[in-house]
């Protein structure tokens, strides 16, 4: 159907259904072919053809065009080789030889279609070039343009030399039966690359002009070549024309290709085969390499080429021995990814400005003899930087030591990021003369050895200063066991060991630092007595002495343990405000000002585009400033500095903290100039919002909290969507007189749904559902016969029967799907893993991918947790064998720590775009997946966990029903029935990943529960833990079922009938359009509208299928049948 999508709805997977569907597509395809035979070009399109007439063959002659079934010629005014090149390429005769004018081309007849044609040479067709207009000219047929092209079959190329090697020598081309040369004017490495590739001789090593590889004789065929290096033949490059030149044979060009170069590499005068002076063999003669611009990237290519993969140092004139003979290469500049040294940029072979005292060398390693560690700092993640290279130990010199260098060291050791760098004065007693000198790290390297220009050896470190670093992993905190992010038992990791903290060792200041480091806002409360459950294992006895201003717990000093006993019953817990820091700035008091957020470590003003009185009131309450009195527009308290954050809060006004409000930041539009959120609070700490009088369904109000009010209040009217998987899709529920109730679907339509979406700040409605599409509600049915005009700001402002007046049951509950409804998935062609694949988001009715730019491990962790896959994962480039996705929706997603969903993470604005090398799609692999094996159902079996690339089991020590509850919930099963021990479903294989698990039952995943460290177990597989859960809850459990095969066939048959009717109507309408004249613009618009309507219907069907509710929809239809 002309490339337009047709989406089949129906969950039936029966063979009968599939046969119906296949038959349907066959019928549609045959009908389409029959219809196409009767269809001409669409209005506004001109059928155009090109040919050469009157020539010796199909690739020479007079240029003729066919327009509106009329053949005509082209005038030769301004006719050049650019135009000829386009004509030849278009006709599949890629080599242009001559541009013929009236003197060489026979005269045509009829129309003269084009004049003053001007091509760049890159057009795909002649009619894409500029010209005076169709049929406009001032020529006669005596000036008809012509061309002579070649299909390349009569052209040959060779390299000529005395040794007879086909891959080096003077370049010669055979044209019109005669061999001739190529002039060296403007000749470059790109030209040489085309020649070597064309001859199958590998890459181009060098080229030379001035007939250095011998002068030829006969014609000089080509001059002033312009190649980009991608051409398949030299004559495909632009040039002056065959035989046109201003050279003689003293300028003949020659080329040496890889297969003719006789190249080799070696290291000499070193302590091993992987170190020494670098020598290169070229054309049978060994020579050296000059050390001009010689650095570690160049050395890394040499080491890799010689099979010694790690470059330790690039040796220059100080340490390398002197060679003799030729100096072959100078000014080498490698990127580091090249496979051979001669692929790097360099001066011409043998051209240099050096002496042998500047010969370059390298020291390489196979990696096994390199070690870097931190010593003397209290853990493996803090201390003096010590290195061991090829069994020689030394220290890192602090001369030139930067935070970027320290960052790389911390990352290499698995210790997070660098918090602090120091230099320790080294005692001369036992001084070492072996030092590692920092080079220039950019901070993105994975190991220190990848940094540029670091040096190793017996150089002097002035003042004996040793480099010292404290990494964030020195004392890394986490919160465990809380019901929401940013709350839980405080656990601290020293090196590789996690332990809890006693409640008398953590002050309010230290708790503030913990919340700040975890990007969880500010501390709300400190709870003792193992409030979130007792930990296991280590209890740290040190007291954290923080000032409260530190960014990381590792920067706080600690007091030695006191002589007092602590057990896990006194484990301390912390509740943070759950969200980023928030403050008021620029006001005359602490209770008014510009709203500023601290996100991703940076303060910036909040955009006011979605800031309202409900949000402002919650902030005032949080800051103990009473209630919100007003939210001034514009930059009332100044624009502020830093990035303007576009977070959108969705507070109801009843929350205690701004972090308790629903919030979205993903895809938020860029904030307009001067749109800065502000608030003026009452300042009365004891003042709270009082309930307003009840609203009638027809009463109008612009907000549940008026913007200006002497006595601020909060109305009872609230709205939510339930059961749709997000805040912008689901069953419509209204809060009235202290309870939530539903809305009846009588007369429910898109206008009503639009009011709901607008009220919830969810965009526009894309579907208005009825018949309890999102499941039946409970309690009151508050509204019925809702009739909106579309201008209302609240659903209860629309006309209705009145509060609680209805003649419905809950099976008629109304629902809505809004354009801001979002869903997340990982998709791959195999469909075997829902925790591995391309990351896609559903937005505005369409699935699209998410870019991987700036995607951090924190962001990947949010994705994996949101999908119920794992706590962490990895992001990789899309595998090359994967099919392209739909357009990309959003890129540059950056999640701070502590967020629940990807929707809360800042990113680029929503915009459909295509993936590119600088903005690639995300392929995510989530870690720590969990499954049940050998059970009788999907919800029973042996518990197995995916960790570090393999599946393993769980030991049954301390295994109980609370542990089973967590696993059942994590797998989406029903209630836990049994926690089974002693390999009840048979022994597993592989590692035993977890032991001594002690869940409370309310954790979101098994790895949130206290347990021994990973793989620390004294169990065998005969002790593998298992569980039994109730089956997964599906809508089938709430409805009767009919005969599945018959139902499926009826559904598929109905769908097929609808498809055929739509297609026949479309075909008839298209034929009507074809009968109209080409100039009828009105009919063109009708044609376009039909296409848009079909696309819109296809998109609607895609939406239902993709939004996660299609299964319920189909089941309900099957039940009704």
UniProtKB/Swiss-Prot annotation:
Pfam families: SRCR (PF00530). A soluble form (sCD163) is produced by proteolytic shedding which can be induced by lipopolysaccharide, phorbol ester and Fc region of immunoglobulin gamma. This cleavage is dependent on protein kinase C and tyrosine kinases and can be blocked by protease inhibitors. The shedding is inhibited by the tissue inhibitor of metalloproteinase TIMP3, and thus probably induced by membrane-bound metalloproteinases ADAMs. Residues 39-1045 are extracellular. It comes from the Eukaryota. It is a single-pass type I membrane protein. Keywords: Acute phase, Cell membrane, Disulfide bond, Glycoprotein, Inflammatory response, Membrane, Repeat, Secreted, Signal, Transmembrane, Transmembrane helix. Residues 50-150, 157-258, 265-365, 372-472, 477-577, 582-682, 719-819, 824-927, 930-1030 form the SRCR domain. Residues 1-38 form the signal peptide. A motif (Internalization signal) lies at residues 1091-1094. GO terms for cellular component: external side of plasma membrane; extracellular region. It is found in: Cell membrane. The keyword Transmembrane helix applies. Residues 1067-1121 are cytoplasmic. Disulfide bonds join 75-139, 88-149, 119-129, 183-247, 196-257, 227-237, 290-354, 303-364, 334-344, 397-461, 410-471, 441-451, 502-566, 515-576, 546-556, 607-671, 620-681, 651-661, 744-808, 757-818, 788-798, 864-926, 895-905, 955-1019, 968-1029, 999-1009. GO terms for molecular function: scaffold protein binding; scavenger receptor activity. Interacts with CSNK2B. Involved in clearance and endocytosis of hemoglobin/haptoglobin complexes by macrophages and may thereby protect tissues from free hemoglobin-mediated oxidative damage. May play a role in the uptake and recycling of iron, via endocytosis of hemoglobin/haptoglobin and subsequent breakdown of heme. Binds hemoglobin/haptoglobin complexes in a calcium-dependent and pH-dependent manner. Induces a cascade of intracellular signals that involves tyrosine kinase-dependent calcium mobilization, inositol triphosphate production and secretion of IL6 and CSF1. After shedding, the soluble form (sCD163) may play an anti-inflammatory role. The SRCR domain 3 mediates calcium-sensitive interaction with hemoglobin/haptoglobin complexes. This is Scavenger receptor cysteine-rich type 1 protein M130. It comes from Mus musculus.
């Amino acid at each position: 159907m002309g490339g337009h999508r047709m989406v089949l709805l129906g969950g039936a997977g029966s063979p009968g259904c599939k046969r119906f569907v296949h038959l349907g597509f066959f019928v549609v395809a045959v009908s389409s072919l029959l219809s196409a035979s009767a269809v001409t070009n669409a209005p506004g399109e001109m059928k155009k053809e090109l040919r050469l007439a009157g020539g010796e063959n199909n690739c020479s002659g007079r240029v003729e065009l066919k327009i509106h079934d009329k053949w005509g010629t082209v005038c030769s005014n301004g006719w050049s080789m650019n135009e000829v090149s386009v004509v030849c390429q278009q006709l599949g005769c890629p080599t242009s030889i001559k541009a013929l004018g009236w003197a060489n081309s026979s005269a045509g007849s009829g129309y003269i279609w084009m004049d003053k044609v001007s091509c760049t040479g890159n057009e795909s067709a002649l009619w894409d070039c500029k010209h005076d207009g169709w049929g406009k000219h001032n020529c006669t047929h005596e000036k008809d343009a012509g061309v002579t092209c070649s299909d390349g079959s009569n052209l040959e190329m060779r390299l000529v030399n005395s040794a007879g090697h086909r891959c080096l020598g003077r370049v010669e081309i055979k044209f019109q039966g005669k061999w001739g040369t190529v002039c060296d004017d403007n000749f470059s490495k790109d030209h040489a690359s085309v020649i070597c590739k064309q001859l199958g001789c590998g890459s181009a090593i060098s080229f030379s002009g001035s007939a250095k590889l011998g002068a030829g004789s006969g014609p000089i065929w080509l001059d002033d070549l312009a190649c980009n290096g991608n051409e398949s033949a030299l004559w495909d490059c632009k040039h002056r024309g065959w035989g046109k030149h201003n050279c003689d044979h003293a300028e003949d060009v020659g080329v040496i290709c890889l297969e003719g170069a006789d190249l080799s590499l070696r290291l000499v005068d070193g302590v091993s085969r992987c170190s020494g002076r670098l020598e290169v063999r070229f054309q049978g003669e060994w020579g050296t390499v000059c050390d001009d611009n010689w650095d570690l990237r160049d050395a890394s290519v040499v080491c890799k080429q010689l099979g010694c993969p790690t470059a330790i140092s690039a040796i220059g004139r100080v340490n390398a021995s002197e060679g003799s003979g030729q100096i072959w290469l100078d000014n080498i500049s490698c990127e580091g990814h090249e496979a051979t040294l001669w692929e790097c940029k360099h001066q011409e072979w043998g051209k240099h400005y050096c002496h042998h005292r500047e010969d370059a060398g390298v020291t390489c390693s196979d990696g096994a003899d390199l070690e870097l560690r931190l010593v003397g700092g209290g853990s493996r993640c803090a201390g003096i930087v010590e290195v061991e290279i090829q069994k020689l130990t030394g220290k890192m010199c602090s001369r030139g030591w930067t935070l970027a260098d320290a960052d790389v060291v911390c990352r290499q050791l698995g210790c997070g990021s660098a918090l602090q760098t120091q230099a320790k004065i080294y005692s001369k007693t036992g001084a070492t003369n072996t030092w590692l000198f920092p080079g220039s790290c950019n901070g993105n390297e994975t190991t220190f050895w990848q940094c540029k220009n670091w040096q190793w050896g017996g150089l002097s470190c002035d003042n004996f200063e040793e480099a010292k670093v404290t990494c964030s992993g020195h004392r890394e905190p986490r919160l465990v066991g809380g019901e929401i992010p940013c709350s839980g038992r405080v656990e601290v990791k020293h090196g590789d060991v996690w332990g809890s903290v006693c409640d008398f060792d953590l002050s309010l200041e230290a708790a503030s630092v913990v919340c700040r480091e975890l990007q969880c806002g500010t501390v709300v409360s400190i709870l003792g007595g193992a409030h979130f459950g007792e930990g296991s294992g280590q209890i740290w006895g040190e007291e954290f002495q923080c000032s409260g201003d530190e960014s990381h717990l590792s920067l706080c000093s600690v007091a030695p343990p006191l002589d007092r006993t602590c057990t896990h019953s006194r484990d301390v817990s912390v509740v943070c405000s759950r969200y980023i820091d928030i403050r008021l700035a620029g006001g005359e008091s602490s209770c008014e000002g510009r709203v500023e957020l601290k996100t991703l470590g940076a303060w910036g003003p909040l955009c006011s585009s979605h800031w309202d009185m409900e949000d402002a009131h919650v902030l005032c309450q949080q800051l103990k400033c009473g209630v919100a009195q007003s939210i001034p527009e514009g930059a009332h308290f100044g624009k502020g500095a830093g990035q303007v954050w576009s977070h959108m809060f969705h507070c109801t006004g009843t929350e205690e903290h701004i972090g308790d409000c629903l919030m979205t930041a993903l895809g938020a539009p860029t904030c307009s100039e001067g749109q800065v959120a502000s608030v003026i609070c009452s300042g009365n700490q004891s003042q709270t919002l009082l309930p307003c009088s009840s609203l009638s369904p027809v009463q109008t109000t612009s907000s549940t909290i008026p913007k200006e009010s002497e006595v601020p209040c909060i109305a009872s009217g609230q709205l939510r969507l339930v059961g749709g998987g997000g805040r912008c899709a689901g069953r419509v529920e209204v809060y009235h007189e202290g309870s939530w109730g539903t809305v009846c679907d009588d007369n429910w339509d898109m206008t009503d749904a639009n009011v709901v979406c607008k009220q919830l700040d969810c965009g526009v409605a894309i579907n208005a559902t009825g018949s309890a599409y999102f499941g039946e509600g409970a309690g009151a049915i508050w509204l019925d016969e809702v009739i909106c005009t579309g201008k209302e700001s609240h659903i209860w402002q629309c006309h209705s029967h009145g509060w609680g007046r209805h003649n419905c049951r809950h099976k008629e509950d109304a629902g809505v799907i809004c354009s801001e409804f979002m869903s997340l998935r990982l998709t791959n062609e195999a469909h075997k893993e829902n925790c591995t694949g391309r990351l896609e988001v559903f937005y505005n009715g369409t699935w699209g991918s998410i870019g991987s730019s700036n995607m951090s491990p924190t962001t990947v962790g949010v994705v994996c947790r949101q999908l119920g896959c794992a706590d962490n994962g990895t992001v990789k480039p899309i595998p090359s064998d994967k099919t392209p996705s739909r357009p990309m929706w959003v890129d540059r997603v950056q999640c701070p720590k502590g967020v629940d969903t990807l929707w809360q993470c800042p990113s680029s604005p929503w915009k459909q775009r295509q993936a590119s090398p600088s903005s690639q799609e995300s392929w995510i692999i989530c870690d720590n997946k969990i499954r049940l094996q050998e059970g009788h159902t999907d919800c029973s079996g042996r518990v197995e966990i995916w960790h570090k690339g393999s599946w393993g089991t769980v030991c049954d020590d301390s295994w109980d029903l609370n542990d089973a509850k967590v696993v059942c919930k994590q797998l989406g099963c029903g209630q836990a029935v049994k926690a089974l021990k002693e390999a009840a479903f048979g022994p597993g294989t592989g590692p035993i990943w977890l032991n001594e698990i002690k869940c409370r039952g309310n954790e979101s995943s098994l790895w949130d529960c206290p347990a021994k460290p990973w793989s620390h177990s004294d169990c065998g597989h005969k002790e593998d833990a298992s569980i039994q859960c109730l089956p997964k809850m599906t809508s089938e459990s709430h409805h009767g079922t009919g005969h599945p095969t018959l139902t499926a066939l009826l559904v598929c048959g109905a769908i097929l009938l609808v498809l055929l009717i739509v297609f026949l109507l479309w075909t008839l309408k298209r034929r009507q359009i074809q009968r109209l004249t080409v100039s009828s613009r009105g009919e063109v618009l009708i044609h376009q509208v039909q296409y848009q309507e079909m696309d819109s219907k296809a998109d609607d069907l895609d939406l239902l299928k993709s939004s996660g509710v299609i299964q319920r929809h189909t089941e309900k239809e099957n039940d009704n049948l």
